[in-house]
Amino acid sequence: MDQNQQQQQQQQQQQQQQQQQQQQQQQQQQQQQQQQQQQQQQQPPNGMMPMNGEQTTPIIPQNRNISLSLVIHRLVEQSYNSLLGLTEGLPKANDLERKKAIVDYLDGTREKFLRLMVLIKWSEHVPTLTKANNIIDILNLEDSYLREAADLLINTQFSLVNARAPIYDVPTAIDVLTTGTYQRMPTNIKRVIPPPPLKPTQIESALERLNDIIKYKLFISDVPKEFQPITVSDGKAHIFVDDEYEAYLTIDGGSEKSNWVILSLNLFVYSKRNLNGEGPIKVAYDNKMKYVLDRVQNRIISSAQPLFELHNIVHYLCISSQMDILASQVENLKKTILKNNIRCVFGKDQSITVFYWLPEDFNLVGVTQHTLGNLMPNKHTNFKIYIDEHQKIKISHYPPITHPKNENYFKIASLNLETILLQAIELNAYDKVYLLNSLLLDNRITANTTSSSSSSSSNNNNTASPIINRNNNNGKPNLLSTKQSNNPLSRSFHLNDIKLIMSSRFSDENQNDSNGNNDHLPTVLRVMLYGSKFLDITVNFQNGKFSLIKSSNYIEFTNHLEQRLNKDPNEIESIVNVFKLKSLLTCFEEASLFLGLECFNKIPLQMNSSNNSESNQLANELFSDSNFICVSISLAKENNPYYLVISIKATCFTPSFHLLFCKMLPKSTIMTLDSIIKLESDQLNKLLKECPIGSISSSNNTNSNGNGPFQSYISTLLEKIVEASNQKINLLSIQSFLKKENINYYQPSQQDIENNNNNNNNNNNNNNNNNNNNNNNNNNNNNNNNNNNNNNGNNGYKNNGITTTTSIVFLFNEQQIQKISPFLSNHISHQTPITISFKNGFYTLSFTQQRPFEYKKYGSGSNININSFGENNSNENYIYRKGNWIFKYQQTSDWFNSFCNDLMTISKITNISSQLLKQMETLEIYKQLITHLTIKPMSIEFVCFVGSNQTRTNVIMFVEKKTAEIKLSFQPYSNPLLVYLEKDINQSPTNDITNSLRAIINSNDISVYINSLISPLELSFYLPLEILVIPRSICQIRLLYKNLYGIDIKLISHEYCAISDSFYSLNSSKQVRLTSINQLHSFMEQRVSLQALDNPTGHRTSWLLPIKQFQKTISRIFIYLNSLNTLKFAQNLMKPNFQPLVPSNPSSQKFSNDYFIVSFSIRDYTSFDIDVTNKNLENSVPSNEELALFCQYFKKKVQQLNYRSQTIGSCIQMLTLPPKILWEFIRVLLEITGPKFDGYTIEISLNTSSIHSKNKESFFHIPDENQVYFILRYLNSSRTDIIPPDQFTDIPIIYNYNEKSIRYWNKLDSNSTSSSSSSTLPKKSLSIVEEVKQKFVEEVAKLIPDALNASSGKSSPISIFFKSFLPKIKPIFSNPTASTLLLIQQQQQQQQQQQQQQQQQQQQQQIENNNFASASSSIR
């Protein structure tokens, strides 16, 4: 125990020591802050040393520590928020995720609090660390001073370099000034001066003579034949050799015996494809061109035939350079994409052999750069570049191929090995593609001749001309031989639009040919398929194999077909047929997607052993090949899937259509085949025959008959097939549904439908007796057809034709009719046939009413029968015409339940209509009160007219389809009893409307008057939002005012009602929140003159009120309630500063303080009244008349609705002022309510709030500080281009009436309303506009003492202020933006400075004038 006590004492001592240390630290921090503030005031800016060299004490940095309590608070708050997040998110996660999240949260929280514990233990050393940090900061600051001093010294050194005087050229300046010239110019400058230029006539004559000499020398000399015609001009001879070189020559003398001199030599050794690029690509010899020119010049001087010598040398140089360039391009060629399929071999005769289209798996044994190895030039595809015996570069190709248009296709002029290779590949590819083209056209000719053999037998003498000539007269293939023939096409191969087209690869590579020749060849064979699709067959330029390019995605079988075509090109016809088949299936697939249907190539289908063998056999035949697609057809309320299978015959490309009925296996995605139907008919065969397949390849893609394009025709065909399938599926689904619901039905024939239509037309013209006879006849037919119902119910599954009958007839039994509605038997019976048909995505149900109900319009004068409904209204789903009903429902909806709901609606509306008509016949008063009655099948409309036209109400009764309940609608005003009226009708088993109808009539005028209170056209003494309407029963309404007072209204008749205080109702125990209305009985009996009714409680709380006086009476009651509420609010505000003089009274109250006696009361149960008198009768400031004017001013303000509570609060705050100060404010109020001041209206704002809660009042008084806080408002009602109308600005000020001073009131600053000694919160910065206002207030406040002295105390400081502030208000109104306000302030400052300067100047001038006058007078 002793040890425990010692430990406790030690802990207490440690805690005391820690507290003392903390107090010392706080004191040190405060001292440091004070020192910092003093040093900041004395220290120069930016931490620089003072200019006078005096050293100041360094700035001690502020304490950058964070409070430990703040750290603990933040850590606990973060942990708590994380825990809240876990509670919200973990219930949605699984068990493993919840456990993981909880463990992560616990680990993280534990780690944070461990760190916090370490931080708490370490916090004991914070003072030492803070001192160390301060020392480091001081040392860093001193170090920065030293560095800045050193930098300034270095900069000074650099700036003094140029601070020296220049050396002046004195001798030159003396010469120029004395003699006017410079005599020291050197004599050698004459050598640099050029001689005078020749004249143009001399130059022209010299050039003409030189041209004549050169022409004569060429005439007598031998010229090589390779030269182009030589041109002579400007003393030069221009020599040009195609694709080799050009040279400019002249002579070195003035006679024909002079030697030739080469002026320039340009070799054309570059690629022509670079002409439009950077220009000619020079060879490696360009660097030694000067050396070459010297050698050639020496050779032609010593030669007897200098021009031949020039040509031989330069020609050999060009040929060698060209071969060297081609050889150098071999390495670049190996870096291209063709590097694995080409080999280049250099021969001993300087030839270059390029082998291309080599297989990638070819074994190159012994092949090097200079040996062929196992490559054989006579077997493998290659071309060879060599120099012939005439010293010309030639190109040969194996196998031998020639261009169909250009014999000299291979030219070395391009000087590009890659271009030559591409030309060879292009020509070889054209030859291979042309072979396929010939095979297809030969097969087409054979098919045409065999198909037209019967027609040509009669014309044996006439021989048919061939469609295509493989070779022309020159033995070259004809490029124009791919035109389509006009002969009839074979059914098995009818899409023969074949053409050769250019490949973008080769045309882009060689787009810049010389001389603009276009020698490109078509290397793509395009075969048109169905629709807009096509098949392109080309040759792979890398390996020389055929490649298939598709316009659709057929990757799964394209590779296999390419292999077949490369093995045997004769397979081209079968390959094209495969693509034709797939393209036709693609057309149907795109058409199904266009129609919004899903398309499948495979479906998980399992054959059902219970089905017949024919269905299984037909399904196996359909799915044996891949020439089919499955289109999914889904209908609403159908769980079993339906598929439309479109299959194409490979021999004739004719589509066939089958409809599959499937069933889903339980808990599986596999389906079983229920049945299968082949859709075929004469109409379908006709559509297939009209298919425009023969003209798909035309440019406009239309047939000769003017039909649409092929794809749109396929879409139309598929749409009709899907429509027929939907009709079949709908027929079967309706049959199964009716069978499931045990509803008798039968499917009528086409003749029965026509007979029924004729009978319906006859029924519309006959009377009711004929209608009954026709119904009996129809019933006999129904009974006969029902006997065959079970036999014919499933015939649709086995019928191979498309069903044309799209209707079913069914009949309800008695139990089903009673289940829908007990009133439905008045419309249909168990013998009434109901026909359902489907078309265009809608179900249409029609029947003839058993006993037609008369729908009428009952007006004031006559009644009009209505024979038809819904024909002109697209929003309604029914049509009624003389007893015949037609209902229309979408297939996606639950049509049967919707139909039953509509039948129930018709029966209920008929029942209510009958009750309403019976009430009007029984009670004569209803005929007067209910007018313009319209009875419709789905609703009832009438006008309730009780009093004047202002209370006319349109009432609509209808049945809501979702809840099957009767609803009411009132226009133009809603009835407060709507909920109880609907409840009363729907709770009645027979939908009795007696009580509801009586309540509607009795509450008609009252509901209109109540709506006028809630949404008035003009504002009154109370706000509409302060009134709450609560229905209590079918004949009682409660009106609440601010949840304090309540008025109960009980309906008695359409002429009288009873109103009472809700506080004294029978359920008063539940209304503990309500307050009794004081002296309501006196108000009702004296002000309204109503007599009280008997009440079980013995209080006079209920009065009988005529409805004609309802609106006026209720409005007076709420005005009285508003006055009571205002009086209660004023009493609460008076309690802190005033003492009550008499006991509390709800209608009046009197208070007093040291200066005044204030009484609040309600005058004549209407208006709120204020009365103020001096407590000291001897005090005449302010006088009773002035106090009366003060009360009258505030009465007017209180009557305004806006900020009424703040107005009362401001009035009470004014009454706390001393009498003399209040007298000043009264004088100001009287003064500002007079005329306008320069177009401005001034008032003390009583209805302005602030953001801060303590400063929300616009006027309040703090007696301890002798200060009044209020706002001066300046309003401008003028209309100009600069000032908008009704603009105002507020100037918040603080008036110290003891010091007679005024300063600006910052309403955003919470410290402005408290003493400066207790202000601890930081001050909030003002906006630019408020800063300008503050400066204006300070400027005007400085003028008040002088103005007070000048007025000798007759004017108050407030009156002086608002008058003096007017010049400052004008620029604020005209320039309301912050930037312009600053400019105005600067301008005013400049104007003041200018005025001061002018005054000083005037004073100086006056002094000088006075001195001058005194001096002149003394002289005189």
Curated annotation (Swiss-Prot):
The keyword Transcription applies. Pfam families: Med14. Residues 1-43, 1382-1412 form a coiled coil. Residues 1-59, 449-490, 750-799, 1389-1420 are annotated as: Disordered. Disulfide bonds: none annotated. GO terms for biological process: regulation of transcription by RNA polymerase II. Keywords: Activator, Coiled coil, Nucleus, Transcription, Transcription regulation. It comes from the Eukaryota. GO terms for cellular component: core mediator complex; mediator complex. Residues 475-490, 1407-1420 have a biased composition (Polar residues). Component of the Mediator complex, a coactivator involved in the regulated transcription of nearly all RNA polymerase II-dependent genes. Mediator functions as a bridge to convey information from gene-specific regulatory proteins to the basal RNA polymerase II transcription machinery. Mediator is recruited to promoters by direct interactions with regulatory proteins and serves as a scaffold for the assembly of a functional preinitiation complex with RNA polymerase II and the general transcription factors. This is Putative mediator of RNA polymerase II transcription subunit 14. It comes from Dictyostelium discoideum.
